[in-house]
């Protein structure tokens, strides 16, 4: 049986700066959770189409690693580690 493609990949940005990379099955709810947690961002951008949870998790890890490669080993401001967890 095929896996559901119900997981969205997204980035939170403050202006043009990526401050968080994540995945969710409910973008509207997740955006509100981030705001309620006090994260400062100007936009939430959905990246590509919905994916399987496994595919989205792999994208998340790779996207954070690419960010780190381009920012002297630093994760986006609100990501706690390179896996997005």
Regions found by a protein language model. Give the residues of each.
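Structure-specific nucleic-acid interaction/processing domains
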Residues: 2-85
């Amino acid at each position: 049986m095929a896996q559901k493609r119900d997981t969205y990949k997204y980035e939170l940005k403050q202006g043009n700066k990526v401050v968080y990379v994540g995945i969710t099955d409910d973008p509207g709810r997740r955006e509100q959770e981030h705001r309620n947690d006090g994260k400062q961002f100007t936009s939430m951008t959905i990246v590509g189409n919905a994916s399987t949870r496994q595919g989205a998790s792999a994208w998340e890890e790779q996207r954070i690693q690419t960010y780190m490669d381009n920012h002297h080993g630093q994760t986006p401001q609100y990501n706690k580690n390179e896996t997005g967890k």
